[in-house]
From Swiss-Prot:
Xref: SUPFAM superfamilies: (Trans)glycosidases (SSF51445), Glycosyl hydrolase domain (SSF51011)
Active site: 185 (nucleophile), 240 (proton donor)
Native organism taxonomy: Eukaryota, Viridiplantae, Streptophyta, Embryophyta, Tracheophyta
EC number of the protein: 3.2.1.22
Species whose genome carries this gene: Oryza sativa subsp. japonica (Rice)
Any GO BP: galactomannan catabolic process
Binding sites annotated in the UniProt record for alpha-D-galactose: 71, 106-107, 156, 183, 185, 219, 236, 240
Protein name (database record): Alpha-galactosidase
pH dependence: Optimum pH is 5.0. Slowly inactivated above pH 8.0 and below pH 3.
GO CC annotation terms, alphabetical: plant-type cell wall
InterPro entries membership: Aldolase_TIM, Glyco_hydro_27, Glyco_hydro_27/36_CS, Glyco_hydro_b, Glycoside_hydrolase_SF, Melibiase_C
Domain of life according to the entry: Eukaryota
GO MF annotation list: alpha-galactosidase activity; raffinose alpha-galactosidase activity
Annotated Pfam families: Melibiase_2 (PF16499), Melibiase_C (PF17801)
UniProt keyword terms in alphabetical order: Disulfide bond, Glycosidase, Hydrolase, Signal
């Protein structure tokens, strides 16, 4: 770089003014972020800042992923017939048309050992036709096939190999089979760091798996929300969910703290849905689905959709709630108000709208009020409030209140008039 001459004259007032204007122009966007702008403009600036942080971009996950995963209901008891019948059921029940597109095989799909060339071998008893044939079947239904591996020597079941030190080989295999999604778990790590192991697979995916959605399942142990956007399309922020109220609510709370890191192309993941597995009440499942939708969490069904009840189907197929999850603005809703288990969760949507959930985590009926000041609306703003579970609309101004049953919720979209 050339040095300035020591004999050069001081800058002119005009030059100083131009420099000040240039500096102000660079600072203005960040200063403006403190202003009271619309949800769209805030979201656009936020997405721009996030895009500059991201190095992983495969064009996938512009909205949170939707589909089905085998683990919560079947654990290791899976086979190719279940996967085929699940794909059929997603189509026949209308769930596929609502956006549930991924049919994801979890752990236990492969033989215990690799073949002589070091390749995965699909389990000969449970997947005798192989994964390629299964992918072809699922694709013919207009759906996508997902598969599972692990950033370790074995998967979490200890019944099949992991992908550690086989990353490129395995991604090439998955791509050759037509796999569309990879869930990548975190067991049997051989004492090697999370960053090393997930970076290796991310690099392999960038080179050989560009059309494969990459879901990191690190369990939130090392704050993946702060770094996984450089590596994949979603990242677990919590440990495994269980089919009970305490587990579901704690996962919601743990995930909430990382809201600023989610957005189009990369999402926080508080784990799969338990709706329909029988461990919670209808009200609790409705709350579960509503909070996951508001928080822009992946909507991955975890029950047996071949035999689900009408009650379960009604929850999973609420198109108005799904629309909140899939909104193009892509901003994760958050807990904005809490009073002894009576909570308000809210977030911005496209077209200046707001999504609001009134959530009663107490064991008694209670009235919950969301004040405009807590959800980013001026007090004078009048809205049309759409109740997403009652499928009815009404006018509101300044606040919205409802009597909410124990462990239940009310969910609204507010559209300024």
């Amino acid at each position: 770089m050339a040095r300035a001459s020591s004999s050069s004259s001081p800058p002119s007032p005009r030059l100083l003014l131009l420099l000040l204007v240039a500096v102000a122009a660079t600072l203005l966007p960040e200063a403006a972020a403190l202003g009271n702008f619309t949800a769209e403009s805030r979201g656009a600036r936020w997405r721009s800042r996030r895009a500059r942080r991201r190095a992983f971009e495969n064009g996938l996950g512009r909205t949170p992923q939707m589909g089905w995963n085998s683990w919560n209901h079947f654990y290791c008891g899976i086979n190719e017939q279940i996967i085929r019948e699940t794909a059929d059921a997603l189509v026949n029940t209308g769930l596929a048309k609502l956006g549930y597109q991924y049919v994801n095989i979890d752990d236990c799909w492969a033989e215990y050992s690799r073949d002589s060339q070091g390749n995965f071998v699909p389990n000969r008893q449970t997947f005798p036709s192989g994964i390629k044939a299964l992918a072809d079947y699922v694709h013919a239904k207009g759906l996508k096939l997902g598969i599972y591996s692990d950033a370790g020597s074995q998967t979490c079941s200890n019944k099949m190999p992991g992908s550690l030190d086989h990353e490129e080989q395995d991604v090439k295999t998955f791509a050759s089979w037509g796999v569309d999604y990879l869930k990548y778990d975190n067991c049997n790590d051989a004492g090697r760091s999370v960053m090393e192991r997930y970076t290796r697979m991310s690099n392999a995916m960038k080179t050989y798996g560009k059309n494969i959605f990459f879901s990191l399942c690190e369990w939130g142990k090392e704050n993946p929300a702060t770094w996984a956007g450089r590596m994949g399309n979603s990242w677990r922020t919590t440990g495994d969910i269980a089919d009970n109220w305490g587990s579901m609510t704690s996962r919601a709370d743990e995930n909430d703290q990382w809201a600023a890191y989610a957005g189009p192309g990369g999402w926080n993941d508080p784990d799969m849905l338990e709706v329909g597995n029988g461990g919670m009440s209808e009200a609790e499942y409705r709350s579960h689905f509503s909070i996951w939708a508001l928080a822009k969490a992946p909507l991955l069904i975890g029950c047996d959709v071949r035999s689900m009840s009408q009650q379960t189907k009604n929850i999973l197929s609420n198109s108005e709630v799904i629309a909140v999850n899939q909104d193009s603005l892509g901003v994760q809703g958050k807990k904005v108000q809490s009073d002894n288990g009576l909570e308000v969760w809210a977030g911005p949507l496209s077209n200046n709208r707001k999504a609001v959930v009134l959530w009663n985590r107490q064991s008694y009926q209670a009235t919950i009020t969301a004040h405009w000041s807590n959800i980013g609306l001026a007090g004078s703003v009048a809205v049309t409030a759409r109740d997403l579970w009652a499928h009815s609309s009404f006018a509101a101004q300044g606040q919205i209140s409802a009597s909410v049953a124990p462990h239940d919720c009310k969910m609204y979209v507010l559209t300024p008039n």
